Amino acid sequence: MLRQDAPGEASYWERHRIDHEPDMNITSVLQRMAANAETADGRPVTPVAYDCNCLEEVCGACTMIINGRVRQACTALVDKLLADNPAEIELRPMSKFPVIRDLSVSRQRLFRALQKVKAWIPADGYYDMGGGPRQAPEEQLEAYPLYTCMSCGCCLDACPQYTKVELTQHDGESAAEFAAREKAEFDRSFAGAHAINQVQYYNSHPTGKMQADDRLEAITSAGGIQDCGNAQNCVAVCPKEIPLTTSIGKIGRAATLYKLKKFFGG
């Protein structure tokens, strides 16, 4: 396991040994490692830090690199991993996000991209406004896979265009100034497939499409869809098998039409 004690510090490898039990997943392995915090040679160490929540591949919290592939720890079954490599299992934190400690990373940039593209439907209040617009069953079937995105970050970690952004607070810089500088850097950097997918989801929704131009403006600004290199790694690693490249293609077309319309004063 690749460990790191704090943000900005050097990482180091550590070997642990866990007794095998049937039907274990990587999250259960990490639970046992944290409960018995010592290396394979018996040296006491600090308990491993990692993120998890739902344990059923819904929340997206437990993303890490397992045997060289970014995926969810809760659905990574030990028996299957050992069948591929009986000698050991290798765990590393995601490579495109700043490490907080060990396998836990900061995904602020991921969520900032969703804010940037307005990945929500605005609500004016909580009054009963009656029935909303209807959506055809065919449209529902097409939209549902896009809705299943759990912001896990797998697509971003596998993307060659999505490079790591890790800033540190300067001497004399206030927390507010640092937050503003970090936000600006996030906005200049590639938003990623997850954000493009959410633009497609909300812009295809009968209510969400009322803010379609706002989302297209955001996704064509700096760090937008024009930075996508079409490597298609995102769709290959998505644990929900979301058709990300289809969303990218549709938003690419919509963005082109939006810009042409804007150029000609439409």
Language model features by range: what are they?
Residues 24-46, 78, 87-266:
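Ferredoxin-type iron-sulfur electron-transfer modules in oxidoreductases and energy-metabolism complexes
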Residues 51-56:
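Serine/threonine-rich, repeat-prone extracellular segments and beta-strand-based repeat modules
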Residues 2, 19, 66-68:
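Short strand-turn-strand beta-turns centered on an Asx-Gly dipeptide
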Residues 18, 49-50:
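A cross-kingdom feature strongest in bacterial/archaeal respiratory oxidoreductases
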Residues 66-91:
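Glycine-rich phosphate/adenylate-binding loop and adjacent beta-alpha elements
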Residues 12-17, 73, 88, 160:
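Well-ordered beta-strand positions in beta-sheet-rich domains
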